[in-house]
A protein has these predicted regions:
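Extended recognition/assembly regions associated with phosphoester-bond processing machinery
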Residues: 1-47, 51-245
Length: 245
């Protein structure tokens, strides 16, 4: 089964550039994106973090997002919009409107949760992507910006940030492998600075466990596509299928 998806990131809705609002630019981008959705009818739209520019976005920025989701759903009702929190976002804020998002076939993964066994809730991070007939054509492994307080302290494998990041990737990929069938794709969406990624002047530095850049070795070869956010430049990182939008 084939899966069609759009990979976007770093919208930074509500951003001001030297005290000038970028709302008009965002309006033009979202209008263009709606045209692409209408024309191509993807199975999923991925937003790989930094949806908003600040943790507490203005009401106008939130309205811009929710109006876009409503318009996108009207043009492609079958399309799922999958979002993760970036370092500019409040993960809890983007998750708390889940009932509203569900109306527009959208889902946000903002934080790493614990399950009833006080372990990492992998179910929350593993999202099926469906086709028009509601068949699962892919799984999206959704990893928001990883804050040390959310990923450490689960067990002996998560005593520090670097170990916790490796453990989280291993556990999530193993769970995805167990669920997927031969004709289903695996897409990993993450908001992170990867080693080998080319930066620009517009990103805010992010530091995890005193080591900012992560290794692409975290991504198992079974992953078909890695949809990255954070670096504001479309690029491949090492492999053809590991990309920033």
């Amino acid at each position: 089964m084939a899966v069609r998806f759009f990979h976007t990131s770093d919208w930074h809705l509500g951003q001001f550039f030297y005290n000038h609002s970028r709302q008009y630019e965002h309006e033009q981008f979202l209008a263009w994106l709606l045209e692409q959705i209408s024309a191509r009818q993807p199975n999923a739209l991925l937003i790989a973090g930094d949806i908003f520019d600040v943790i507490n976005p203005a009401s106008s920025a939130q309205k811009q997002l929710y109006q876009f989701l409503a318009d996108a759903h009207a043009r492609a009702p079958h399309m799922q919009t999958l979002m993760i929190a970036g370092n500019h976002d409040s993960g809890y804020r983007i998750e708390q409107v889940e009932p509203l998002l569900a109306k527009y076939n959208a889902k946000a993964v903002g934080v790493i949760h614990k399950n009833s066994q006080q372990q990492i809730d992998l179910e929350h991070l593993l999202v099926p992507i469906l086709d028009e007939q509601q068949n699962t054509v892919a799984w999206c492994l959704s990893l928001p910006f990883l804050r040390p307080a959310e990923i450490t302290g689960f067990n002996e494998h998560t005593t520090n940030s670097q170990n916790a990041i490796a453990y989280l990737h291993q556990q999530l990929i193993a769970e995805a492998k167990a669920r997927k069938t031969a004709d289903q794709a695996l897409i990993l969406m993450s908001h992170a600075h990867m080693q080998g990624g080319e930066t620009s002047d517009s990103e805010r530095p992010i530091v995890i466990g005193n080591e900012e850049a992560l290794s692409t070795a975290l991504f198992d070869e079974i992953i078909d596509y890695v949809a990255l956010g954070h670096l504001h430049k479309p690029q491949k990182v090492g492999e053809e299928h590991i990309r920033y939008s």
